[in-house]
Amino acid sequence: MAVAGGPAGKGRDISLAALRRHDPYISRIVDVASQVALYTFGHRANEWEKTDVEGTLFVYSRSASPKHGFTIMNRLSMENRTEPITKDLDFLLQDPFLLYRNARLSIYGIWFYDKEECQRIAELMKNLTQYEQLKAHHGTGAGASPVSLGSGEGKEADILRMLTKAKDEYTKCKTCSEPKQISSSSAIHDNPNLIKPIPVKPSGSRQQRGPRPGQTSDPEPQHLSLTALFGKQDKAPCQEATGPPQTLPLQQQQPEKFPMRQGVVRSLSYEEPRRPSPPVDKQLCPAIQKLMVRSMDLQPLAELPESRPCTDALRAACAGPAQTGSPRSHALAAPGTQKLLQVQSIPGAENRCEPGAPAPASSATTPVSLAQPTRLSSALPPQTPGPRALPRPAPPGPGPGHQPVTGPGEVSPRELLRRLQAVQQEQQLPAPGRPALAAKFPTATLSTRARNPLEPWRDPPPSTEQPAPLLQVLSPQRIPAAATPPPLMSPLVFAQPSWAPPQERSRAPLPPGNQDPAATPTGLLLPLRTPEPPGTPGSALSKLQLQEALLHLIQNDDNFLNIIYEAYLFSLTQAAVKKTL
């Protein structure tokens, strides 16, 4: 066997001494490459990756088995790359790279700075590999360990020889089993004969595996060569080298798992259509059903009380405050929407509606003191500061400027949906309860209090309290049904408002409903008596209350916004006139 020459003399002796510090069985240096770098083929990324190994490559012979090997003395770190040359190695030359695959089925590439050294080392590696294969085949048979080649060197204990023998025995034991029984990753990497195509691989794959040059005399089936992997390109898919031992067992298990997955999909697809939807709309009144399906408006069903078991009580809550001609009346329809929601949330509330019950509102000409106290359902739970909190319907009582001027159907669907969303958001806020006692309504009316749920419940000064009919707070069980509601009176007729001089009317404390007296349509109010000056003046609004009042009026009262805008334009013109002067 001809071995190419390399550096000789004293330099080689120094290198041999350095190599023997790592492996004392090295006998001599066969060849040397001055500058190389090691690359590894990434299995998952399907590309070459540079390692931290870079330096001089030494090909040497050993006095123990394996007889030959090569080492890259790393210049970057203390970790060198050592690979024994055995019959399981496979080399392929692609200038300036020398590709090889070891017994663990790992693919590496050695980059050479000098192309002549690359060709020389590649020829040497192939010759040494063929020599090891011939020795293993003619010495003890195919697949046997080349331990017998070193038997003439004495009976000294060699740990590397013992490890090689144990590995070969383990390899022979594993080749007798079926590939699908090998499931551990260590067995796949440690078994060089695992990718033989005998049990499962089709016969056409044998034609794809061409034998390496010089191996025609070996009757044993060989691994996939690097020529088939990297014959025409530097980067080939790693699945061709490591695919058969991993994909073949999965192909056998796939027909078993596939029907089970299909069964799961079928069961899910059959069960989904049979999921029953919650029957919410079946137990609701027609008015609530129309509200849930986003109807254009709430149409009255009939004019006779006998044909309206439940609808008029609900319509008195939503259509009464909402059917006005001013923009403010649209903002005051939220208590009615709140009442509709609360009847839906309380089970059996639609069954408690009594047809033929008296109307919940009084006439414009009949005093309330001559009749029974007006029965109103309050949306205030125990100790709740606002009537639009949780969980009872809102009072259907009217406020100033809420006489039924126009017919039903004035509320637009967009306005109705907006109020519904606002009521649902307020119902989710936790609020302390308020005992269901008789509530006295001083200056603030029911409609104004319903527009601000966060307003604190304030009593008027003692001097302003006069005997007035009490609006009793009832549960939803006592919601009565009524005929067509008569014209409604303003509650200001029955409650003495706080007195303020006419010239200071704008400075007087606003009601908790945040209504602006200047923005209120005067055509819809009844004439009121001029109150006498009380003994103590009313308390002023806080900053938070004033802010909420202004925001509410700007968002819901177009007349108030127009007044502010006109004042703003007037101030601009006045400022411009002053600047010109």
UniProtKB/Swiss-Prot annotation:
UniProt KW Phosphoprotein keyword: yes
GO molecular function, one term: enzyme activator activity
Residue spans of biased composition, Pro residues class: 382-401
Composition skew (Low complexity), residue ranges: 244-255, 355-367
Record field: catalytic activity: a 5'-end (N(7)-methyl 5'-triphosphoguanosine)-ribonucleoside in mRNA + H2O = N(7)-methyl-GDP + a 5'-end phospho-ribonucleoside in mRNA + 2 H(+)
Gene encoding the protein: DCP1B
Protein name: mRNA-decapping enzyme 1B
Lineage top rank: taxon: Eukaryota
Assembly description: Interacts with DCP1A.
Record-level GO cellular component terms: nucleus; P-body
Keywords carried by this UniProt record: Cytoplasm, Hydrolase, Nonsense-mediated mRNA decay, Nucleus, Phosphoprotein
Enzyme Commission number(s): 3.6.1.62
Transmembrane region(s): none
Lineage: Eukaryota, Metazoa, Chordata, Craniata, Vertebrata
Main location: cytoplasm
Modification Phosphothreonine, positions: T366
Any Pfam family the entry gives: mRNA_decap_C
Bias type Polar residues, positions: 204-219, 368-381
Residue span of region Disordered: 181-222, 236-258, 349-411, 427-468, 498-522
Broad enzyme group: hydrolase
Biological function: May play a role in the degradation of mRNAs, both in normal mRNA turnover and in nonsense-mediated mRNA decay. May remove the 7-methyl guanine cap structure from mRNA molecules, yielding a 5'-phosphorylated mRNA fragment and 7m-GDP.
InterPro entries recorded: Dcp1, mRNA_decap_C, PH-like_dom_sf
Similarity annotation: Belongs to the DCP1 family.
Positions carrying Phosphoserine: S145, S269, S326, S412, S475
Subcellular localization(s) per the UniProt record: Cytoplasm; Nucleus
